């Protein structure tokens, strides 16, 4: 798994989902926060493989925390009716896989 590219793809999917949420009549009030966390995840994992091992672990944990934050906002959007399970499923699956890869490599 190329964590840098996967994190970038995750950030893009989060941005697309936020755009969708903003286009709906009932706008999800935490969409901006979800977008910020998605971008943080992508930026923290950028060029991860080029870093020294200690820095790599620290940045991987930072990126994993941002992924967790996105998944939390995503769950809030689903439970409050702004998204369906189906609408959230792709980003949720991507986030879970990315989080696992980041945490495994950070340990």
Can you name each region flagged by the protein language model?
Residues 1-107:
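Amphipathic alpha-helical assembly/interaction segments
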């Amino acid at each position: 798994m190329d964590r840098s590219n996967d994190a970038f793809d995750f950030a893009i999917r989060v941005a697309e989902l936020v755009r969708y949420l903003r286009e709906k009549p009932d706008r999800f009030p935490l969409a901006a926060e979800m977008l910020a966390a998605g971008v943080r995840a992508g930026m923290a994992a950028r060029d991860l493989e080029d870093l020294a091992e200690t820095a790599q672990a620290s940045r991987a944990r930072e990126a994993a925390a941002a992924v967790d934050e996105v998944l939390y906002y995503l769950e809030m959007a689903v439970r409050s009716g702004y998204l369906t399970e189906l609408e959230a499923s792709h980003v949720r699956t991507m986030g879970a896989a990315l989080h696992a890869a980041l945490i495994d490599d950070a340990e």
